[in-house]
Amino acid sequence: MVFRIASSPYTHNQRQTSRIMLLVLLAAVPGIAAQLWFFGWGTLVQILLASVSALLAEALVLKLRKQSVAATLKDNSALLTGLLLAVSIPPLAPWWMVVLGTVFAVIIAKQLYGGLGQNPFNPAMIGYVVLLISFPVQMTSWLPPHEIAVNIPGFIDAIQVIFSGHTASGGDMNTLRLGIDGISQATPLDTFKTSVRAGHSVEQIMQYPIYSGILAGAGWQWVNLAWLAGGLWLLWQKAIRWHIPLSFLVTLALCATLGWLFSPETLAAPQIHLLSGATMLGAFFILTDPVTASTTNRGRLIFGALAGLLVWLIRSFGGYPDGVAFAVLLANITVPLIDYYTRPRVYGHRKG
């Protein structure tokens, strides 16, 4: 008798896929709420734009391929791709950026490979990286969290800035990015990297308003804790497994601690790494993508650890302040190799 060995994914039950995607969308609510609270209504506008763009792009491709549009859209994967991209970009980024990134993610990074289950790279992170490389200024223009912001635009102002670049009173991104010290604010990771390169001491950097949080950066620590809460709920629901988040966070914390102990004057402390940027979003919502992550338990541990190491290396020595998106995509490349060497041994066969 001959058995055919198929490549992953080994199961593709649409109802099960739809349920898992829905659970992930629900788990994202705390993180979305935190970003709305600290950065204003722009996040919600970006989510709406990305969701509509993702659904339309997927429907268009399915129509061209003469596949069932309604049945495929019900798996909620397009919505999740749009959501992950929307919460990763600055809340007041121009409308066309999130549309461009989402369409690229769905059509090029997902459907071009054959659709859900066939794409080797995380589509949302492909879209994010394309935008970051193409439009670095806009993609790094985050607002200061409301704790240290001079102005937080309301819902109408957020819409006007996203679609026209100005508020009703004539304010632009330069004025909206001002902090309480009158200086344009960046993210904690971006501020740290820029200030170290400018020759500032870590002691000086930690006095900046952006680091006024209890544990890490103002606002960002609570956003990360909110994503952590959603991620723990996913674990409780058994929608994801613990291997990737744990190995990712442990490796990132270990590397950050060792680096900080050996070079405290140039490298960020571990709590800055763990509670800033897209750390918790990446650990629980992006790296755990069942299509692009390793499929064995040992492989998941290696995959998560590799991503954690890459995030620390990029943040500490690379040209970009965060690095989660690049780390995810680089780790995605290694998945076939990891799965090959960590696949379970067939019972009755000798090792090797």
From Swiss-Prot:
Organism placement in taxonomy: Bacteria, Pseudomonadati, Pseudomonadota, Gammaproteobacteria, Enterobacterales
Keywords: Cell inner membrane, Cell membrane, Electron transport, Flavoprotein, FMN, Membrane, Phosphoprotein, Translocase, Transmembrane, Transmembrane helix, Transport
Native organism: Escherichia coli (strain 55989 / EAEC)
NCBIfam families: PRK00816.1, rnfD
Protein name (database record): Ion-translocating oxidoreductase complex subunit D
Transmembrane segments: 20-40, 42-62, 78-109, 123-143, 148-168, 214-234, 242-262, 267-287, 301-321, 322-342
Self-association state and partner proteins as the record states: The complex is composed of six subunits: RsxA, RsxB, RsxC, RsxD, RsxE and RsxG.
Task of the protein: Part of a membrane-bound complex that couples electron transfer with translocation of ions across the membrane. Required to maintain the reduced state of SoxR.
Name of the top EC class for this enzyme: translocase
Modified residues (FMN phosphoryl threonine): 187
Family: Belongs to the NqrB/RnfD family.
Originating gene: rsxD
